[in-house]
Amino acid sequence: MAGTGEVYKGSDGVWGFRVKASTGQIIATDGGYGYTSKDDARATLQLLLQGDYAGPIYEIATLACGQEITEDTTLDSDLVCAGGPALVVAADNVTLDLGGYTVSASADTVGSGPGIVLQGVTGVTVRKGTVQNFGAAVVIAGGGNNVVQNLTCQDNVGSVGGDFGDGIVVDNSSENRIEGNTVRRNGPYSGISLLGESRHNQVLDNIVSDNNMLHLGDPSAGRQAMGIRMEGPKADHNTVSGNTVTGSGADGIVVLPTCIPGSEPECAGSPPNQHNLITNNISNDNGTSGRGDGIRLFTVANPVAPAHTTIRENVADENQTNGIAIDAAGNNNPGPTENRVIGNSAHGNGAYDGFDGNVNPRCDANVWEGNDFRSVNQRCVSGEPAPASGSRSDEV
């Protein structure tokens, strides 16, 4: 193959290679998932230049801001756009490979719209590059069974009155995989969000850090961003596993209560977010705005609380408020929440390592078993049988 080659290390730490023509234009790039070492990338590049490479090669396409992607596409340079969306994936079963390059909003349009939108598509992969300075880095809107992988999503900040303020958003979309991304300095909502009826999604092995940004245009709003949040309603059967979540303005990993507008009376009849699995995560040092838990099942008086959640084998240390917390169920819950907190470790948190706000009955129907906590707010959180309500020994 004519041309000269170069190897490069992407923002995700994975090595890849490119082939350049004599003009300096990139004419081919590796179409695989990258290499863990520089030597492996170089060896494969040499095979390509010798004509012996049998792996996938993607043709380089020159892209324009706002372009619709309808076929396999790899960036050949950075892309700077006057606001978002910068790129819209509008066809099923295609790969958008950023090739280690950066898609960003220009300095005067920071926070305006999303960077990359997957619009009602299935079977799409977006990978290997950086998306920054939009209202959100990547939005999966509808569709399903897509992959967002090995991206750096940073400095995406929502403006007042805008729809976003997140790193990666899954909006009414199911069976997607969000894996191996670095998601940092986004806000004021979250690093990664699952909104609406988003089911059977996998959020795996991401580094989610320092998501605590202010709203653009209103310095009094923001810094309440959550690391990973399942908002719903009907955000069910999702798996959040292997992530490292630190430095969130509010809570690290959160399942929120639900309230469908117009529900009568006061949220009654809203479906809970339920059957979600939170496992093998590290969620430390969250709550930089002054209040935040490592992992939280969040509710307030009227919205319907999360139910049937499993929180298993996580670490939640040094958070501003609690390590792992289940808020008291709201007034309109259709029945016991029946969450399970099993085999976790939490130490050095500001209030309690383990917290359950349900006091009548103690811990409701939630199960706390085999956890390593040094401080809890009531005995049932330690896995001990709760005494009769009203006893002086109810509290720890």
State where each predicted segment sits:
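Beta-solenoid repeat scaffold
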Residues: 72, 86-102, 120-124
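Short N-terminal "domain-start" leader segments
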Residues: 1-23, 30-31, 39-42, 47-52, ...
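Short, tandemly repeated low-complexity microdomains enriched for cysteine and small residues
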Residues: 28-34, 56-60, 217-218, 255
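Extracellular beta-strand/beta-solenoid scaffold signature
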Residues: 81-86, 109-117, 133-140, 157-171, ...
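Leucine-rich solenoid repeat scaffolds
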Residues: 338-395
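Short, T/G/N/S-enriched strand-turn elements that build extracellular solenoid repeat scaffolds
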Residues: 64-68, 83-90
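Small-residue (G/S/T/A) turn/hinge positions that recur once per unit in extracellular repeat modules
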Residues: 91-94, 121, 143, 173, ...
